[in-house]
Amino acid sequence: MKIPSSEMEWKMIARDFGEKYQFWNCLGALDGKHVAIQKPRLSGSLYYNYKGYFSIVLMALANARKEFIMIDVGANGRVSDGGVLFYTKFWELYQQRSLFLPQPGTLPSTSDIFPFVFIGDEAFALGENLMKPYPQYACNNEQKTFNYRLSRARSVVECAFGILRTKFGVFQKNINFEPSKAALIVATSCYLHNYLIKTSRKQYLTSSWKVETQSSEQLLDLEPTNNRNPSRDAKMIRQKFCHYFNNEGKLL
């Protein structure tokens, strides 16, 4: 799969999120999952994750159509969960400012300027281009509204993972291959997922994906991170979105 390589491509993704989920200027929903594998030979505890089993990590960015627009798979399960993102090609391109992200722009019903952002859950660190929920234990009503709007838009990546889990039998038990082969199997499944959405969308997505799998260890969430002292600008941007969702951008 190809990461968007122009502002126009990113803006098309953002338009879909705005029209479908009313989260404007959103460039994609980010999430990561543990994929259970057999213990690799001579690896010690390298792939042993916080849940107590061996895994590799699948990191993915999804668009509003439930397609993967970026995947990175193969990091060992022992890596600090929130830190997996920093080892991906996606993050490398972001740090190098090579993603060709759109310049900040206005949202409907306001002349204020907002950056384009990615959205994630508690496993990720808040950043100027990465929004995450406010901590649940200390939310006021406006912050709860922000969390709801973010969760609503971010559901696309959870849904994409849910479809993978149900449609591909490989995700219903441990993958009994070495990490490199397991990563190839996982990546191939993600490519097939995208292909089927494009060519047989209605048939592929019609059947319910909310079916419990045989293994509770497959595609489990990453561990939430502790507060990483986000920058003042990142906090202000989240607060700006929060204010918008409770005022000009309020759902009617």
Region roles according to the model:
Residues M1-L252:
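Short, polybasic Lys/Arg-rich linear motifs in disordered N-terminal/cytosolic regions
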